[in-house]
Amino acid sequence: MANSQTVMAMIRLARPPFRNNHDKVAFAIHSSFVASGYILTATGRPAFADEALSSSSQNDVGIEGWNEFEGEYAFVYANPKKGSKKILVKCLAMDDKLLVDAIADGGAEPAHLEIKVGDYAEESNEGDYSAQFKNLDKLVTDLQSEIIDKLDGKPKPVASRAQSSSETNEEPRYYDDTPNPLGPQIHPSGVVVPPIPGNGGYSDLFPGPGAGMYPGRGGFGDGSMLVGPTDPRFFPFGDGSDRPGFMGPPHPGMPPPGARFDPYGPPGVPGFEPGRFTRQPPRGPGGGHPDLEHFPGGSDFI
């Protein structure tokens, strides 16, 4: 595998003449192939011939005539370690770029690379070749990955991130799976909170028949937000229908007679007798609903 040091050593050994910066980059490409184990079998005019790839010649040739065409370069290589399969490389100067195309004998598609010449060639014409190049490491790396490795059939490495089994198999958790304790719940302060019987008060979240813009009468005996006379929080061992002064259970699908119940305390507590909560006389026309509408007389009514 070529690197910038071996490529520069090949350039110094060949001592090629450069007419411009495109020449410098084109010869650096040639030196990268030689440093990767390829031998040059044709360059210049013979490399542009139609039979350049099909020629049986495997002889190593010199670099004479490699830049005889202005802005066009061609090289034919063979690699003895890879069955002497031939490779044709052509470079075309276009403005400040050098377009590189390479194809192997019998290959289906060519490898392609666009190189910005100014990123790798200096304007210096000094005898020291190292002063005429810059960023040679990147140029050699790009040639290796985009041209040479593809011609050799090496797959391009793809960065991937290994995911743990918990990332790939674990389903998202939308609900709290903390178990609900059946016994008394002890607060860190030491206060014991007894569990409340019933379903926890969910019936008023799911309206039944007659649901509309006005709320219906709350649940009765189902632990809803609106506490009724048969609420299990007051009578956990029955429906409350046998308590004195309480009406019987409602008919299926129908609320009990009268308005909806407002919350009141358990029986026997002074000031919370059920008889104190009676149905108000009908309101006259034009009166607002006390729970759902603004007070009559304007928004500043007190």
UniProtKB/Swiss-Prot annotation:
Gene3D superfamilies: 3.40.1000.30. Residues 259-269 have a biased composition (Pro residues). One of its GO terms (cellular component) is nucleus. The keyword Acetylation applies. It comes from the Eukaryota. Disulfide bonds: none annotated. GO terms for molecular function: endopeptidase inhibitor activity; proteasome binding. The modification N-acetylalanine is found at A2. Residues 151-188, 259-302 are annotated as: Disordered. GO terms for biological process: cellular response to auxin stimulus; negative regulation of proteasomal protein catabolic process; proteasome-mediated ubiquitin-dependent protein catabolic process. Pfam families: PI31_Prot_N. Could play an important role in control of proteasome function. Inhibits the hydrolysis of protein and peptide substrates by the 20S proteasome. Belongs to the proteasome inhibitor PI31 family. This is Probable proteasome inhibitor. The lineage of its organism: Eukaryota, Viridiplantae, Streptophyta, Embryophyta, Tracheophyta.
